[in-house]
Amino acid sequence: MPSLEKAVVLEFINLLAVAILILLTGFFVAVEFSIVKVRRSKIDQLVAKGKKGAKAAKHVITHLDEYLSACQLGITVAALGLGWLGEPTVQTLLRPLFHKAGLNESLTHLLSLVIAFLVVTYLNVVIGELAPKSFAIQKAESITLLFAKPLIWFYKIMFPFIWLLNHSARLITGVFGLKPASEHELAYTEEELRVLLAESYKSGEIRKSELKYMNNIFTFDKRMAKEIMVPRNEMVSLSLDEDSISNLQETVKQTKYTRYPVVREDKDNVIGVINMKEVLFSMLTKDFSIKKHQIEPFVQPVIHVIETIPIYKLLLKMQKERTHMAILIDEYGGTSGLVTVEDIIEEIVGEIRDEFDADEVPHIRELGKDHYLLNAKLLISDVNSLLGTDLSEAEVDTLGGWFLTQNIDAEPESAIEYDGYSFKVKDINSHHILFIEVKKAE
């Protein structure tokens, strides 16, 4: 065979080898990202259904560290081979072109070397890394099922080298007193999880309601009972000394609650709680008289807790005590309010409204763009989240309380501007602010 033909064949073989090395890089990159991204629960479902390749895929993702090492070895070997073979091959193809252009040998060598480096790098990054990575992230399940077996074969063939490299790395990290990192043992901060959830919502993986629930859970253990309580002045209570079942009937007609705290003398002495279901069942019996029966036989024990207790601890305590209501006390032992299980659950799922809440005004009522009617009991933290403001929570918990710290002579239509918003009192009962209108300051 003439020397020219040999050179052409050799160049063709070299180009083919370069293409194979780039494809191998793409293979290992795609497999690496797909086995990390794929959900183990989904693979378990496919194994149960007998899906082809599912068992191999499960084996790979349950031994993730070993197979990630195999992928990294494959990428490294392919990259070294590409550097060793790719640039000289492309450089050889370019040199005749520069010679024909009349360039001297030094300039020809320099230009062909630089261009060959750029071409090989471009092809390797685009075809060998970026494209496979994007494809693997979007089609993680399919790629894992398709390439799990080839990856297992590669791992078995290269096992001595992988074992040697892993143990060498462990020895080096051990010298510095470090434990070897495990790629699949990832821990995320709360903020990182919030970002991941937000991205999942934007991509359509989760619904808006699910995003809201998860974000509420993150703040759940930071909330104190006093932040969600029904304050003392709004508690509807029954007096053990004065109220009969007949009086109770009138109270229920007006307020429509299921449970009521029972007090002796005043609200600082809450002795129990009464459940209207028990009263109703008794009223259905023939010998029950509304006028004669007192409420004392129906009074059940109620728990008392400090108002600063975290709501997650309070929920656990209420579950343990099998009660739906807790009385909150302040540092001086006086009653500050009450909390029900419903109040706590609403911190996760949002406001729960039954058939008797039809006339109740929501805490947040949107009137227009950057224009709201807010319940004065709304927590300052919720107001800041809604408006993007920075109202101080140092002294008070609620929007109404904050307004009074800014204007102690608040009355209807009193207004202040703060942090780019106008806050105006729309409804007030004595010194108790009920609703505040908020809109973007002009």
From Swiss-Prot:
The UniProt keywords, alphabetically, are:
CBS domain, Cell membrane, Membrane, Repeat, Transmembrane, Transmembrane helix
Q: Which organism is it from?
A: Bacillus subtilis (strain 168)
Q: Which InterPro entries match?
A: CBS_dom, CBS_dom_sf, CNNM, FAD-bd_PCMH-like_sf, FAD-bd_PCMH_sub2, Ion_transp-like_CBS, Transptr-assoc_dom, UPF0053_domain
Q: Which SMART domains match?
A: CorC_HlyC
Protein's cellular compartments: Cell membrane
Name of the protein this chain belongs to: UPF0053 protein YqhB
Q: Which family does it belong to?
A: Belongs to the UPF0053 family.
**Ranges of residues in domain CNNM transmembrane:** 7-210
Q: Which CDD domains match?
A: CBS_pair_CorC_HlyC_assoc
Molecular function terms in GO for this entry?
A: flavin adenine dinucleotide binding
- Membrane topology value: Multi-pass membrane protein
Which Pfam family would be a valid example here? Answer: CorC_HlyC
Instruction: Kindly indicate whether the keyword DNA repair belongs to this entry.
Output: no
**A GO CC annotation given for this chain:** plasma membrane
Membrane-traversing stretches: 16-36, 74-94, 110-130
